[in-house]
Amino acid sequence: MTGDRELWRVASDSGTVVCWMITCCEGAELQLIDGERIVLRELYPMKTDLYERARTLEAEYRERSRESG
């Protein structure tokens, strides 16, 4: 069974970045999508590690959004 889940979304003047978790039986993939483009793909055997990385990235992107806005 597979599943996709949007974890967060950050909008700024330059566009919107969306973080997705794509799951399958081998683990989970974290994807950052900026507009139509995948800008980051990372594989994790454990969802807990993926969630931790997603929180770190969200904080970074929210900070960038505040600085540019």
Question: Where are the model-predicted features located?
Answer:
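A short, exposed loop/beta-hairpin motif centered on an aromatic-Gly-Thr core
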Residues: 36-49
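Acidic-residue sensor for enzyme active/binding pockets
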Residues: 6, 29, 42, 58
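Edge beta-strands of extracellular beta-sandwich domains
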Residues: 42, 68-69
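Short, surface-exposed linear segments at secondary-structure transitions and domain or protein termini
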Residues: 26-31, 48-57
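The feature represents the first ordered module of a protein
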Residues: 1-17
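Short aromatic-glycine-(Arg/Gly/Cys) micro-motifs in beta-strand/loop hairpins
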Residues: 16-39
